[in-house]
């Protein structure tokens, strides 16, 4: 069961007037700000000069709103959280190999607490399930309401989903193989 309601308040004003919030019964919160919107914000950050106050303001709002997880930095620690900062823009480039997730910080912290106390493989698959749910929900909604999802890039979503699926399949297989050898 899925509860769908509009989000009246937005941290990033002007870009997210028609945000959707999706909450499932497990209490996971999805802020349906589209990937294309995040790209617009990021491009605006990059286009502003280093002395412009707007860059810091937008960067801080993005930092509060999103957790950006880079597949390239995962390794054995499962995932590493990064934040957009003006001094480290190159490390925060939003590419096909970057997972963009708008989980609130407390939910992310709970996820990592469970990572320490439960099986690592199970936690990976659990997170992958939530990510897949998020991206496929966005993918289906984009056909029904383009105004809300603001020019959704279908090709980007599909490529990202398959990259995530391939990554988690590979890491899970390798972990199982290592456990058998031990």
UniProtKB/Swiss-Prot annotation:
It is found in: Mitochondrion. The keyword Mitochondrion applies. One of its GO terms (cellular component) is mitochondrion. Keywords: Mitochondrion. This is Uncharacterized protein C1442.11c. It comes from Schizosaccharomyces pombe (strain 972 / ATCC 24843).
